[in-house]
């Protein structure tokens, strides 16, 4: 759940902005309210690095394999993905509708010396001539009122031949049991009410909306939690958390 991007223009959800703004100070606390993000971030980043390297013909073993490429992190929150991706060489622009989230992200980037262009913005507010090699939307679509409109604005920022990377929760009974009941009410990983199961998006729905915007999904992968080791891993099972990689054109 990079749970944060809801704007005040066309893809608006003031309630969601308020919810995640209230937790903004906790973004970089690995034991705090965003602990799940810190836990599965390595899995997400490994998936991205592997597929970005293959698509752009870069050497994955290099420290900064993506020098010269631009990336837009839509709903960047406190910068938990923006910063490590910038360390990989991307010129990263992180946008979020919550000004407090952006303030936290900027401060942390200054403290760590990682160059990220953070903006209080939504995709439709960006310069229409501004385009990116990669557009990222991780754990965001389940928090917007109109997924189709949101994806339309986000993918419009993608260059031809560019990559869209997304992640969300599947609308299954298993996802309701684990991501809502388990994570919010039993384990207390997230504040109650963080997720609305009705807003979860099936992989087929996500892929179809992207296809309508000229993006072909090339790869999907799930993420599974092991309670014994307190770790996440990539899996072929898409029943709960899943990621997808698509190419425009």
Curated annotation (Swiss-Prot):
Pfam families linked: Methyltransf_23
Statement: the UniProt record of this protein carries the keyword Transport: no
Residues that hold S-adenosyl-L-methionine according to the record: 44, 75, 96, 138
SUPFAM superfamilies tied to this protein: S-adenosyl-L-methionine-dependent methyltransferases (SSF53335)
Pathway where it operates: Cofactor biosynthesis; ubiquinone biosynthesis
Sorted UniProt keywords: Methyltransferase, S-adenosyl-L-methionine, Transferase, Ubiquinone biosynthesis
InterPro entries linked to this entry: SAM-dependent_MTases_sf, UbiG_MeTrfase
GO biological process: methylation
Gene Ontology MF terms in the entry: 2-polyprenyl-6-hydroxyphenol methylase activity; 3-demethylubiquinol 3-O-methyltransferase activity; polyprenyldihydroxybenzoate methyltransferase activity
Its EC number(s): 2.1.1.222, 2.1.1.64
Keyword Chloroplast: no
Broad class of enzyme this protein falls into: transferase
Top-level taxon: Bacteria
Reactions catalysed, as given in the entry: a 3-demethylubiquinol + S-adenosyl-L-methionine = a ubiquinol + S-adenosyl-L-homocysteine + H(+); a 3-(all-trans-polyprenyl)benzene-1,2-diol + S-adenosyl-L-methionine = a 2-methoxy-6-(all-trans-polyprenyl)phenol + S-adenosyl-L-homocysteine + H(+)
PANTHER family xref list: METHYLTRANSFERASE (PTHR43464), UBIQUINONE BIOSYNTHESIS O-METHYLTRANSFERASE, MITOCHONDRIAL (PTHR43464:SF19)
Job description of the protein: O-methyltransferase that catalyzes the 2 O-methylation steps in the ubiquinone biosynthetic pathway.
Family note: Belongs to the methyltransferase superfamily. UbiG/COQ3 family.
NCBIfam families named among the record's database cross-references: UbiG (TIGR01983)
Protein name: Ubiquinone biosynthesis O-methyltransferase
């Amino acid at each position: 759940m990079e749970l944060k991007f809801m704007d005040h223009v066309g893809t608006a959800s003031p309630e969601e902005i308020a919810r995640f703004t209230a937790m903004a100070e906790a973004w970089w606390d690995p034991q705090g309210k965003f602990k799940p993000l810190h836990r599965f971030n390595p899995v997400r980043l490994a998936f991205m690095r592997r597929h970005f390297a293959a698509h752009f013909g870069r050497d994955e073993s290099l420290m900064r394999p993506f020098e010269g490429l631009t990336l837009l992190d839509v709903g960047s929150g406190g910068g938990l993905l923006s910063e490590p991706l910038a360390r990989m060489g991307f010129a990263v622009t992180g946008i979020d509708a919550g000004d407090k989230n952006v303030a936290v992200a900027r401060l942390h980037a200054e403290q760590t010396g990682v160059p990220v262009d953070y903006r209080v913005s939504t995709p439709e507010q960006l310069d229409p001539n501004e385009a990116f090699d990669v557009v990222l939307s991780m754990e965001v679509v389940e928090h917007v009122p109109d997924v189709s409109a949101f994806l339309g604005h986000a993918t419009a920022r993608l260059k031809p031949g560019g990559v869209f990377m997304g992640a969300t929760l599947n609308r299954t009974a298993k996802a309701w049991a684990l991501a809502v009941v388990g994570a919010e009410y039993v384990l207390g990983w997230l504040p109650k009410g963080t997720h609305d199961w009705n807003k979860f998006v099936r992989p087929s729905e996500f892929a179809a909306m992207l296809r309508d915007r000229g993006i072909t999904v090339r790869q999907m992968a799930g993420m599974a939690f092991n309670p014994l080791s307190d770790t996440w891993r990539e899996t072929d099972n898409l029943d709960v958390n899943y990621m997808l990689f698509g190419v425009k054109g």
